[in-house]
Amino acid sequence: WYADEGEDVYIISDSLRLHGKRFKNSGSDYALVCHGYTSKAKHMAGFVKKFYDRGFNVLAVDARAHGDSEGAKIGMGWPERRDIAGWIKLILSWDPDARIILHGVSMGAATVLMASGETLPENVKAVIADCGYTSEWDEFIWEAETLHIPWFPVLNAASLLSKLRDGYDFKQASALDQVKKSRIPTLFIHGTEDELVPYKMLGELYLAAACEKEKLTVEGAGHALSSSVDPELYWSTVERFIEKYIGS
């Protein structure tokens, strides 16, 4: 279904040609769907189908340095937040009246949260962030400690290199700081058994968010598995949240 129904679309962002799949539906509701680290848009096919069946037009995007998009470096959401603005612009070129929700899983969740702190068009009505991390720095420290690898001074050096080469360090790449500025209603989702992005980050992000907000905890769900572990709870919560901000 995904391969048959989707139309390839492209934007240029930061001089990179980025790829997405567009799934046309009637009406002006759009879901912009963002995958996780080292994944690709087509791995989000289940989410795409859910939104499509609910009547949404769907745009599933390959993040820079993933899938069919150009790029040599994965930015963990920070440069990617600008790419999200580019995709929103493309949607508005198709339909100036578009009502857009941003949905991301893992790094995709961090990306849409980082984007939410920017000045986005009023067309963006809601954000759904499934197991996003607080910042690139926090995530790397968590992973190092989980693997019992000393993170100092390697992480500090890598962060400095990123600052020199790419213009930002790992602490700047912060969803936590961005949600403090967000005015877009946000649903935070996290599984209690997430070992890759710790469950405690849900609480930190939720507390920091300045926007209207809700949170969903999925008991027993590991990383990025909330929708598989309890699909009924996941999608009924998403459905209610969406209806609140863009109607049924």
Residue ranges and their predicted role:
Residues 1-26:
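N-terminal cap/lid segment of alpha/beta-hydrolase-fold proteins
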Residues 47, 184, 198-207:
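Short alpha-helix in the alpha/beta-hydrolase fold that links the catalytic acid
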Residues 48-70:
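Conserved alpha/beta-hydrolase
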Residues 66-95, 99:
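Catalytic nucleophile-loop/oxyanion-hole region of alpha/beta-hydrolase
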Residues 114-169:
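Hydrolase active-site cap/lid region
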Residues 181-183, 188-190, 194:
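Short beta-strand/loop motif that positions the catalytic acidic residue
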Residues 192-197, 224-225:
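Acidic catalytic loop of the alpha/beta-hydrolase fold
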Residues 221-235:
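Catalytic histidine-centered segment of alpha/beta-hydrolase-like enzymes
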